[in-house]
């Protein structure tokens, strides 16, 4: 009897212990599940990229007027029976005969960013076909023929789109310059796969499950079966730089600066057109069309026939082909070739190519403005990053004279002399002096006494000039030529900018600022010795007894006459001020930023505000004031605005 009672007690105890263990295990499993779900949610939230999807409103009058410059075509697509050509200045619509019908300008109807790709697609979340447009710095824009909408990532690096590929599911594959390959599914924007991040993507071809990804310097990646294979020069690729990819069935063709690599079922086969710089590819039936940099358009038989490629347009303007496209899926349909300077149609009879349309002509030579000035005669001087300069006559701006040679090539600064009428131009190949008529008179370089050939800035100094270079300073006046550099106490040899105020000159360098009185260095300012937030000084101007300094990464700062620094409320943070993109007028201070637009300070209130509407690019590079206007240069064109329109 006692043994039976004890057995029951032990049984009850065992059941209780077992139940407790099961409960404990259940709690642990439940908690583990919660943690796992939380981790997955956190990982998903971290991998997803925040973005804004918005409809672009019709433009308002921003006050900015364009100074016409050449439009560089980048790509084209057919849509609703018309041709749409995308380029640096915007989107241009043409009817079937090549006659212009509408145009949509960047900074007006479109975001202030060059357009780089365009294609037709039906995206997830949309019920109709649209033109899908890739931009250089404003994400993705879609257009249904009447309304534009934008997909703008919060991450600025994800806004620089380099390639787009719509898929059959309605997803959009997006190649970027710094964030690798992204996928947009209509609701979510995220990296395509962890192995394809941090790439500079140049081209996309294939499908979501069998995808070829071209890169700037890492060859080509083949995504298939949930994994990726890489091919570079060691695997048969003629060059690690990839500019074009075309896919048909199991075959893929990868073009670059040294020819075309052919792949079959993911395996390298051979090199076609060796030595040709191939920019774009199109497969038409049994023929591979290759648009090249210098060899026109090549027609290459896909079969192993041994026949040499057929060439078109090796002479004349049919060069530097940006895109080849067909109007339909049939090889007999119309074929188009897009270059920077025009669009060409293939002659169905003779097989050659004829010009169909071209971009609007411009007054200026180039769009990448690096320096501006208005001289005492009212002429506008426009310096370019790599195309010399234009001298624009009169306020009506109807005629421009172009100057470009071995010295007047990369222009950094233009300084007119109001007394003599002469103009000094700082270039990467010397200091070039022009007379009052705008004729080149003299080139001064290292051989003539400068400390370096590369001149970054010029400022008035006594009865002459002070010249900034990456190797230090050179003073040129009636006493002759002499130089200063770090050995003499200059804070850093690499001088970016100069600002003169009476006997004082402030030199902004890569390593801080130096204040000179005459040719004597009176003080140096760095982050270690002052309240300066960044040593890299890119721009400087004298103002109200002190100085304003622009930096590369810490915005603007004011230095008073005693050397005390104050950060600028509203224009500090991580702002990058472009070299010498700082100007003061009687009413305001203007600062040009890298990727953030134009910053304006009202001198009475001291308040800064940003201006982006009406600009052709958010990379503002130069200013000039004259003829009743403020001229604003960017890396994508020049605009002007009456100064009072900038007041708020």
What are these regions (language model features)?
Residues 2-648:
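Carboxylate-rich, polar loop motifs that coordinate divalent cations or form catalytic acidic clusters
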